[in-house]
Regions:
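Membrane-anchoring hydrophobic helices of lipid-metabolizing enzymes
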Residues: 1-72, 77-110
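Conserved Motif II region of HX4D acyltransferases
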Residues: 51-56, 115-138
Length: 138
């Protein structure tokens, strides 16, 4: 039997018995970010969040925006989108597990298709790592 990669193990976990963390836990975890930054969300009240949605964004520096977006959607609307993450996230010991625990999956076309097939809301930043690490002049 072939040995599965850590990313494959995490994907199996994410699609197996994924149980979302409590909204309160995510909200507490993001408290330092909310204290430092003041994110503003516009137009979400016009969405029918009883149906799956695809949230697409551009990353801010160091990718802190993803957690703030998840926190807001989950605590205010009860929606925890599943994030499509760069492959690197799932190679970092401990971090890959944390991303998976909060609904993240490796950003592959197959995983995106599976989330859509399951009727999940999805959060994706198409610019990925390239966008997170861009210089001010880019």
């Amino acid at each position: 039997m072939a040995t599965r990669s850590r990313a494959e193990q995490l994907a199996e976990q994410a699609f197996g018995d994924f149980t979302p963390p409590s909204a309160e836990k995510l909200h507490r975890m993001m408290a330092p970010m909310r204290a430092w930054f003041s994110p503003q969300f516009y137009g979400l009240e016009r969405l029918d969040l009883s149906r799956p949605a695809l949230f697409v964004g551009n990353h801010a520096l160091f990718s802190i925006d993803a957690g703030l977006i998840l926190d807001h959607l989950y605590t205010q609307y009860g929606v925890l989108p599943r994030s499509l993450g760069d492959h690197l996230h799932f190679q970092i010991p401990g971090w890959g597990q944390a991303v998976t625990d909060y609904g993240g999956v490796e950003g592959t076309p197959e995983n995106c298709s599976e989330l859509m097939r399951r009727g999940e809301s999805i959060l994706v930043f198409p610019g990925g790592a390239r966008e997170v690490n861009r210089r001010k002049s880019d």
